[in-house]
């Protein structure tokens, strides 16, 4: 089935019914996708401040009301506890489980943060003629923990996570221009070229997602990634945090064109 041409609400319904459980890259072309962080209210201000201080890695699209599983703006009929293909639960910084629903874990003090995802600009890259390798290879995007320190806020501190896409040399400028127009979904790359400069020792062994082929004449290009909060959570070890599983996003009703240059 070609999910790229489906409406976001249709795909969310399939996810809620358990009919889609894999990565969402390439789905609902032209619509923004969002990373998810759910944490107790007592940690919400610190995380909001962390996101504000690290807008490249954590560009906020929406924050929920306390205890609410619904959103007001980016996906009004969404259920935050059921409309993502796969969730991760961290307790004291340790990954304790992955679930297709977190309804059974929901608490009245939870606050949800929806963070822009680079999957959003992939349809723009494809439209501009720039290849997206993990879509070609039908796998998840490779993601790496770097040596780039995030700006700390409250209890939150740690290293930035990046996503990597191999780009032909002659299309790097185009890819920077296309993605730079969309700062709400990470914007321009944080690094282009030699992976070791940002602390990546083996480009074939991502910390999250899948390895992809880098062809002759291509260079690895790295964008800030909304999996950064998961790296931070593993570092600071709060009692409980729920996130999306890397590559498994909330598909919003917000069109890419509406968040360009914003």
Swiss-Prot record:
One of its GO terms (molecular function) is lyase activity. Keywords: Lyase. It comes from the Bacteria. It holds the Pfam family D-Glu_cyclase. Its EC number is 4.2.1.-. Gene3D superfamilies: PSTPO5379-like, PSTPO5379-like domain. It is an enzyme of class 4 (lyase). SUPFAM superfamilies: PSTPO5379-like. Belongs to the D-glutamate cyclase family. This is Putative hydro-lyase Cbei_2760.
């Amino acid at each position: 089935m070609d999910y790229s041409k489906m409406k976001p609400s249709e795909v969310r319904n399939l996810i809620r019914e358990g009919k889609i459980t894999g990565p969402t890259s390439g789905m609902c072309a032209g619509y923004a996708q969002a990373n998810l962080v759910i944490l107790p209210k007592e940690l919400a201000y610190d995380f909001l401040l962390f996101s504000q201080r690290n807008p490249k890695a954590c560009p906020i699209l929406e924050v929920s009301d306390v205890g609410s599983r619904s959103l007001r703006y980016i996906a009004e009929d969404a259920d935050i506890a059921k409309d993502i293909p796969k969730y991760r639960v961290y307790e004291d910084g340790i990954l304790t489980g992955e679930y297709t629903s977190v309804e059974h874990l929901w608490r009245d003090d939870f606050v949800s943060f929806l963070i822009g995802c680079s999957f959003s600009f992939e349809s723009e890259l494809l439209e501009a003629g720039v290849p997206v390798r993990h879509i070609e290879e039908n796998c998840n995007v490779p993601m790496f923990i770097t040596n780039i320190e995030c700006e700390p806020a409250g209890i939150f501190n740690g290293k930035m996570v990046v996503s990597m896409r191999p780009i032909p040399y002659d299309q790097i400028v185009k890819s920077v221009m296309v993605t730079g127009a969309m700062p709400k979904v990470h914007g321009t790359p944080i690094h282009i070229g030699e992976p070791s400069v940002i602390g990546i020792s083996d480009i074939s062994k991502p910390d999250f997602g899948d390895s992809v082929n880098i062809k002759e004449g291509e260079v690895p290009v790295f964008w800030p990634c909304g999996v950064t909060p998961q790296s931070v959570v593993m570092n600071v070890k709060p009692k409980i945090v729920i996130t999306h599983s890397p590559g498994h996003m909330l598909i919003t009703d917000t069109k890419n064109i509406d968040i360009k240059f914003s």
